[in-house]
């Protein structure tokens, strides 16, 4: 029925919804309805029953699902907690790794703990006693009386059964006990030992003999259970037995033997009672073991169930002999148990006291009970042994008694215990308790309770503090309140009782015995309290008046016991637990309640009172008597102080927050920059970014190390030294270039994002760290803060993005190869460093930056990578990008660039050719062609925009006036007006700034960048043409240059051979020679010059840069100071000057290299080849062809890059365009003719090429690794696709056909100038052309703004616009288009118009059709001249135009700010072309 009713209730609810028509068979019937219709059952009833069953099943399923859901929630919560717990573990482990954590094993000095507990307890107890003791005593007495009433029945039965046996045994035993113990304690001893004495009196000799036989084994308790508290507390794990331990174990063993003997001898006392008691003991032991936490249950159950074994015997003895013993002994037992709970320390003290109450009686009783309690004691012995061991381990002097050992009196009581035990347990001391047991049982509750209560109280006090045996209950009472009485007899008994209570006491006081294990386990410290607890028992046991009087006599001591009593008695066992409360409460109040309940077996009082008062003790002792708890808590803290808590709280919070950062910085920073990078990545990237920005100095070295390991391992060491410089520079440059470029490139330019995202992903931290180092060097060289500031502002925001960007590495296929090759990077980075320093810097800002920071150092490092590159040149064959770029940069970065720059310089004019050849050499020396343009364009597109943008923009602006004239004019103006020195300086500064701020670094940097970067260029270019989406730009660009898109991939290995066939026009021939020489010669030179550069490179390369752009670079340096200030850092100007000198030297070196040998590879040999082919154009073409290992167009980009490297000031802004911008920039700087002065000036203004170049130079390493990433980044700038972002130069290429290889990028830039090519490029890559529009209104509004501003500024002054716009472009780093926007604006500069004629002439000579195509694309963007379209493939003259156009387009694409007034009209049409190309 009850089931039916709830169902009925639920059913009506379902009836309503289920009764649409109130049809009986459609509604869910209730049970009542079914019951009513049972008589008239029909189909409708069946239907209703079915509905009811279905409804019931649905409800059941619903509830089941709800329950399942709840279970799932619980599982989820539990799993989350599990995770949290393990996270906490991990935090601790991490803390332990970072912070020393000491794990100590503390030995609790029971005596000290007891003394402290007593000291603390006495004043507190005195304060508390008057107010609290009276109610507690009254409660304890009431509970005790109830327990006594229950015990009286059991005791009466036990007395009746045992009187016959126990009387004789007790008499004999009393005599023995009297001999050993004082007469006053004789009754107590009889009470305690009565039963045991009865059993042991006669067979004591047998028991002793048996014990002696068994002593060897009994002496050795089983070791502690592994993992148990005792196991941890005991240094010897219970294996080593000290004297006290052995004694206690012997006593326990004797008790066990006595239990065995007792089982045999129990018939003498009363076999029936013993059997009953055995059953009771087993039950009580079950209660103890199972219900130890339940104190009241133990007391009542044990007492009810018993008189249980020991409780019946001991309690009966104590109750019968001395009801004081009942009160005294039981309270002592309760105290003992409570003490054991309260503390393992209290086990020692309380063990003695309680053992006195229980212990003496227990041991004696247990010996008698051994027959009864053999099995239970044996069962409990393991626990008892462990408890004894723990107590003994605590006392390592180890009193035999568990309690005695820990009690302050244990030391004295130990020998006494031994004598007691020797007499009782071992000797015949058990027999002495026997008379006591008989007497105690005979001494009925009435006498012992009230008559002997006073005596019992003092005895219990004595027992508790002195651990005196129960036999002298008066002493125990005194001991309760005072620890003074240390009667040896009582002590001996107490020790016995303690050991018995633990071992045999487990049987009697399973509550008591097991509590002791708990007490020992629960707290070692509380043992001190155990001594005191016994005293309260007599108090409570004594009638209210007597107990108070008994306590009053020890009143001064009683306050201590009283307080303890009250503390424990708070629950109700106050009298018994009085001192226990004090001591036990202090030691461990919570354990005390448990022990009290167990102790209450012996003391019915204590069992009830303690059960209640034990809980109250916890509350009151802890609450009201805070002192008691305070002491145990303090003791617990001694154990627990666990430096974990403080260290955890401090360590986890502070270490996790503070230490993680500092340690991450210090450990990782100290640990090799690599760890910092790892930390940066491991640490939340936001944190790592911030830290890295702050840390960049540390992380720069680590980034360099990381990047270098990723790239050439050799470079890593040098880069690590360099990072110091890089740090400061990177902060600006890095924020500006690397941080911004990775971030902004990721944000701004899709393609740049790929490059930069690759870098940022890879070296987001690295970019932050390393680029910063690069910037300082660049700053040192250029000392232009303006560029840094605009970018640093952007960079700071972007650094976080940069850290986020690590995901972007996937964005560009090229970048992926870079990072996929990061393991390979050793070869690739050098390659890309050669091909693009910008990409390397971005991909691996650290590496490229290392080169920048200290070119000299970086160059040796790169020189080693260059060696790797020669090896990689073959891999590059496997990977067209890497292989081809290796040949270009592989032979010698210097030579590769030198060749390119030499070609461009010759292109400019015959007179300019000499000067420009030097710049070209300079470029080749630096491998800045790749480093400069590629590194500059990808990296500087955002970060090094000023250098790349400006260098490329200047070139673009050159083309703006007239394609044909602008190329020559562009270079001629820079070279003639400004002098070739400025152009050379600008180029050298570009290289230097690209690689590092100092000339010496340039020397080193150049070899590295050249060796590492040039090979990547060629290989990357070839691969890009065939493989990369960027190749789209090249294919269209290949329309003129690139019939060879298929061929360019093969050319990489035979660059020279394949390229000629790819090239349809003169470019092919020039390229063929240059490319062949490039790859073959460069590979050789890379090996040779890498060695040379390692030894000589610092000086030779330094000299080479100066020669490269000595005249042009001087003008460019002057012009480019402002833009460089904005982009890489203020250090760039220094590099310009240094580079100008170095470039002069390097130009001579390049000339020597190119003329003397093809060591410069195609790049340097190409100048010689180029000059014969064309005054200025062939060398460029050769350089381009050398670049175009895969593509004839690539060779042109190579030229452009070479020139860009030479005139890095120009290409500083162009770095995002990378190859294209680099290519156009080199053409401008190398073709520099009289017109080149103005161009170089405008270029300098547009892009402080030295400044930007330096950042670019440092970047090459990373970009070398990520050739594809460079182009991907640039195309992505121009268009969301990685192709369009290539940056200004790349802009046109990516516009037409997202240039697959780097060469294609340049080719597309070349095509871009040409109207027809622009159209083709638009058709091939319409998406890129539109993105290219970023100049005017590309993807990003900031770019548009920059474009508009730049366009306006170009009209006013090309130079200023260049710097301003370049900074703006840098500021708009977040958008890839900004780089291109800056570049198109640069294209429209009047500079370009001035230089266009000379630059085109130079480019026609230096750069054949391919370079023309590249420049044509650029020209079309800056100043659309349809001539360049045709010139791309038609003739050398046209190729010069194309070269000019390339530079113009590069300039336009490179920097928005660079375009001058002349460009605005042209830049807009070219911007359209750029848009088309990028679309």
Swiss-Prot record:
From the broadest rank down, the organism's phylogenetic lineage runs: Eukaryota, Amoebozoa, Evosea, Eumycetozoa, Dictyostelia
Q: Which family does it belong to?
A: Belongs to the FAM21 family.
Question: Phosphoserine-modified residues are where?
Answer: 1249
Task: Tell me which UniProt keywords the record has, alphabetically.
Answer: Phosphoprotein
Gene giving rise to this polypeptide: washc2
* GO cellular component entries: cytosol; early endosome; phagolysosome membrane; WASH complex
Q: Which GO terms describe its biological process?
A: negative regulation of actin filament polymerization; protein localization to endosome; retrograde transport, endosome to Golgi
Which GO-annotated molecular functions does the record name? Answer: phosphatidylinositol phosphate binding; retromer complex binding
Name the record gives this protein: WASH complex subunit 2
- The UniProt regions of compositional bias labelled Low complexity, in chain numbering, are 1-17, 334-349, 465-475, 514-532, 709-723, 951-968, 991-1000, 1010-1021, 1147-1162, 1277-1292, 1419-1445, 1452-1466
**Compositional bias ranges of the Acidic residues kind:** 242-279, 422-431
Signal sequence, renumbered to the chain = none
């Amino acid at each position: 029925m009850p089931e039916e009713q709830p169902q009925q209730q639920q059913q009506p609810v379902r009836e309503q919804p289920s009764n649409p028509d109130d049809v009986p068979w459609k509604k869910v019937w209730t049970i009542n309805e079914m019951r009513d219709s049972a008589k008239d059952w029909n189909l409708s009833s069946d239907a209703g029953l079915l509905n009811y069953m279905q409804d019931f099943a649905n409800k059941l399923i619903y509830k089941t699902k709800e329950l399942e859901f709840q279970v799932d929630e619980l599982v989820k919560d539990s799993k989350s907690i599990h995770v949290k717990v393990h996270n906490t573990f991990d935090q601790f482990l991490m803390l332990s790794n970072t912070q020393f954590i000491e794990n100590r094993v503390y030995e609790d000095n029971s005596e000290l703990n007891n003394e402290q507990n007593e000291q603390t307890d006495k004043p507190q107890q005195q304060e508390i006693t008057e107010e609290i003791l009276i109610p507690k005593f009254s409660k304890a007495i009431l509970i005790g009386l109830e327990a006594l009433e229950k015990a009286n029945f059991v005791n009466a039965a036990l007395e009746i059964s045992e009187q016959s046996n126990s009387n004789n045994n007790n008499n004999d035993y009393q005599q023995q006990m009297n001999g050993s113990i004082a007469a006053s304690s004789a009754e107590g001893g009889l009470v305690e030992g009565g039963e045991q004495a009865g059993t042991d009196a006669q067979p004591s000799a047998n028991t002793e003999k048996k014990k002696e036989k068994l002593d060897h084994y009994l002496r050795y308790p089983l070791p502690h259970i592994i993992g148990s508290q005792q196991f941890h507390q005991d240094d010897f794990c219970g294996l080593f037995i000290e004297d006290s331990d052995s004694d206690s174990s012997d006593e326990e063993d004797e008790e066990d033997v006595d239990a065995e003997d007792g089982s045999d001898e129990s018939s003498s006392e009363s076999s029936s009672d013993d059997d009953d008691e055995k059953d009771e003991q087993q039950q009580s032991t079950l209660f103890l073991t199972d219900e130890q936490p339940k104190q009241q249950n133990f007391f009542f159950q044990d007492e009810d169930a018993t008189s249980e074994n020991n409780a019946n015997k001991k309690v009966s003895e104590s109750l019968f002999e001395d009801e004081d013993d009942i009160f005294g002994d039981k309270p002592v037992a309760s105290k003992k148990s409570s003490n054991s709970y309260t503390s393992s320390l209290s086990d020692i003290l309380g063990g003695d006291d309680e053992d006195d109450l229980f212990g003496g009686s227990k041991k004696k009783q247990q010996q008698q009970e051994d027959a009864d309690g053999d099995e239970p004691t044996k069962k409990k012995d393991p626990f008892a042994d462990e408890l004894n061991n723990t107590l003994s381990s605590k006392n390592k002097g180890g009193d035999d008694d568990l309690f005695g050992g820990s009690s302050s009196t244990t030391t004295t009581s130990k020998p006494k215990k031994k004598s007691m035990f020797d007499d009782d347990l071992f000797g015949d001391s058990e027999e002495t308790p026997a008379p006591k047991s008989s007497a105690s049982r005979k001494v009925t509750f009435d006498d012992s309770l009230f008559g002997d209560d006073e005596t019992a109280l003092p005895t219990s006090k004595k027992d508790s503090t002195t651990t005196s045996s129960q036999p002298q209950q008066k002493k125990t009472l005194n001991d309760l309140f005072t620890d003074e009485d240390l009667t040896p007899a009582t002590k001996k008994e107490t020790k016995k009782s303690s050991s018995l209570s633990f071992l045999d006491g487990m049987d009697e006081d399973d509550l008591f015995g097991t509590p002791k294990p708990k007490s020992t386990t629960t707290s070692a410290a509380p043992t001190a309290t155990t001594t005191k607890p016994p005293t309260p028992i007599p108090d409570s046991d004594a009638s209210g008046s007597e107990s108070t009087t008994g306590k009053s006599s020890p009143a001064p001591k009683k306050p201590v016991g009283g307080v303890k009593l009250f503390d424990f008695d708070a629950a109700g066992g106050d009298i018994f637990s009085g001192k226990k409360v004090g001591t036990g409460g202090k030691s461990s109040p919570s354990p005390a309640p448990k022990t009290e309940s167990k102790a209450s077996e012996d003391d019915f009082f204590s069992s009830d009172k303690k059960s209640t008062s034990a809980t109250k003790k916890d509350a009151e002792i802890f609450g009201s008597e805070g002192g008691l708890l305070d002491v145990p808590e303090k003791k617990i803290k001694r154990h627990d102080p666990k430096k974990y808590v403080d260290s955890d709280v401090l360590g986890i919070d502070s270490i996790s927050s503070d230490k993680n950062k500092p340690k991450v910085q210090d450990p990782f920073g100290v640990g090799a920059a690599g760890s910092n990078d790892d930390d940066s990545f491991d640490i939340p990237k936001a944190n790592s970014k911030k830290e890295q920005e702050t840390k960049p100095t540390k992380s720069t070295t680590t980034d360099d190390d990381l990047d270098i390991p990723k790239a050439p391992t050799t470079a890593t060491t040098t880069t690590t030294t360099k990072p110091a410089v890089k740090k400061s520079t990177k902060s600006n440059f890095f924020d500006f270039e690397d941080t911004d470029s990775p971030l902004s490139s990721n944000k701004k330019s899709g393609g740049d994002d790929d490059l930069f995202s690759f870098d940022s992903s890879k070296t987001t931290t690295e970019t932050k760290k390393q680029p910063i180092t690069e910037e300082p060097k660049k700053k040192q060289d250029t000392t232009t803060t303006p560029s840094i500031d605009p970018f640093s502002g952007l960079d700071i925001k972007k650094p976080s993005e940069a850290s986020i960007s690590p995901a972007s590495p996937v964005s560009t296929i090229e970048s992926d190869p870079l990072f996929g090759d990061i393991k390979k990077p050793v070869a690739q980075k050098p390659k890309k460093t050669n091909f693009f320093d910008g990409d390397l810097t971005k991909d691996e800002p650290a590496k490229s930056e290392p080169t920048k920071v200290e070119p000299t150092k970086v160059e040796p490092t790169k020189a080693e990578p260059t060696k790797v590159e020669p090896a990689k040149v073959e891999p590059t064959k496997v990977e067209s990008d890497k292989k081809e770029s290796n040949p270009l940069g592989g032979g010698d970065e210097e030579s590769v660039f030198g060749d390119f720059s030499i070609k461009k310089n010759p292109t400019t004019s015959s007179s300019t050719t000499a000067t420009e050849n030097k710049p070209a050499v300079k470029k080749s020396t630096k491998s800045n062609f790749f480093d400069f343009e590629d590194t500059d364009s990808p990296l500087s597109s955002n970060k090094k925009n000023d250098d790349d943008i400006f260098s490329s923009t200047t070139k673009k602006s050159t083309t703006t006036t007239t394609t044909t004239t602008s190329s020559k004019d562009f270079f001629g103006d820079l070279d003639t007006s400004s002098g070739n020195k400025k152009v050379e300086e600008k180029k050298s500064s570009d290289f230097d700034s690209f690689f590092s701020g100092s000339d010496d670094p340039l020397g080193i940097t150049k070899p590295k960048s050249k060796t590492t970067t040039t090979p990547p260029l060629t290989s990357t270019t070839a691969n890009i043409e065939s493989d990369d989406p960027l190749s789209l730009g090249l294919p269209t660009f290949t329309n003129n240059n690139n019939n060879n898109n298929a061929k360019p991939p093969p050319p990489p290995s035979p660059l020279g051979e394949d390229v000629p066939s790819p090239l349809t026009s003169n470019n092919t021939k020039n390229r063929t020679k240059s490319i062949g020489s490039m790859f073959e010669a460069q590979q050789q030179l890379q090996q040779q010059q890498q060695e040379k550069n390692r030894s000589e490179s610092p000086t030779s390369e330094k000299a080479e840069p100066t020669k490269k752009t000595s005249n042009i670079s001087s003008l460019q340096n002057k012009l480019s100071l402002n833009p460089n200030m904005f982009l890489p850092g203020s250090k760039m100007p220094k590099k310009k000057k240094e580079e100008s000198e170095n470039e002069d030297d390097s130009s001579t070196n390049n000339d020597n290299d190119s003329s003397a040998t093809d060591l410069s590879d195609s790049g340097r040999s190409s100048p010689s080849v180029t000059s014969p082919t064309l005054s200025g154009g062939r060398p460029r073409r050769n350089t381009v062809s050398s670049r175009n290992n895969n593509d004839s167009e690539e060779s042109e980009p190579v030229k452009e890059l070479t020139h860009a490297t030479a005139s890095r000031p120009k290409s500083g802004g162009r770095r995002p365009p990378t190859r294209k911008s680099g290519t156009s920039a080199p053409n401008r700087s190398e073709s520099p003719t009289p017109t080149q002065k103005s161009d170089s000036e405008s270029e300098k203004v547009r892009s402080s090429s030295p400044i930007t170049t330096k950042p670019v130079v440092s970047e090459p390493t990373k970009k070398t690794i990520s050739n594809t990433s460079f182009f991907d980044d640039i195309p992505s700038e121009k268009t969301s696709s990685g192709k369009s972002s290539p940056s200004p130069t790349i802009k046109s290429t990516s516009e037409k056909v997202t240039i697959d290889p780097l060469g294609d990028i340049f080719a597309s830039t070349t095509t871009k100038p040409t109207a027809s090519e622009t159209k083709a490029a638009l058709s091939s890559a319409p998406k890129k052309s539109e993105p290219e529009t970023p100049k005017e209104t590309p993807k990003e509004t900031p770019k548009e703004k920059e474009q508009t501003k730049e366009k306006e500024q170009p009209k006013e002054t090309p130079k200023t616009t260049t710097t301003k716009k370049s900074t703006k472009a840098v500021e708009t780093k977040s958008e890839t288009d900004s780089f291109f926007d800056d570049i198109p604006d640069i294209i429209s500069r009047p500079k370009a118009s001035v230089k266009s004629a000379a630059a085109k002439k130079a480019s026609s000579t230096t750069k054949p059709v391919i370079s023309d195509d590249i420049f044509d694309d650029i020209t079309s963007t800056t100043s659309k001249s349809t001539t360049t379209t045709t010139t791309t493939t038609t003739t050398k003259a046209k190729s010069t135009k194309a070269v000019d156009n390339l530079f113009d387009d590069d300039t336009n694409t490179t920097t928005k700010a660079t375009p001058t007034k002349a460009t605005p009209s042209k830049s807009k049409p070219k911007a359209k072309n750029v848009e088309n190309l990028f679309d």
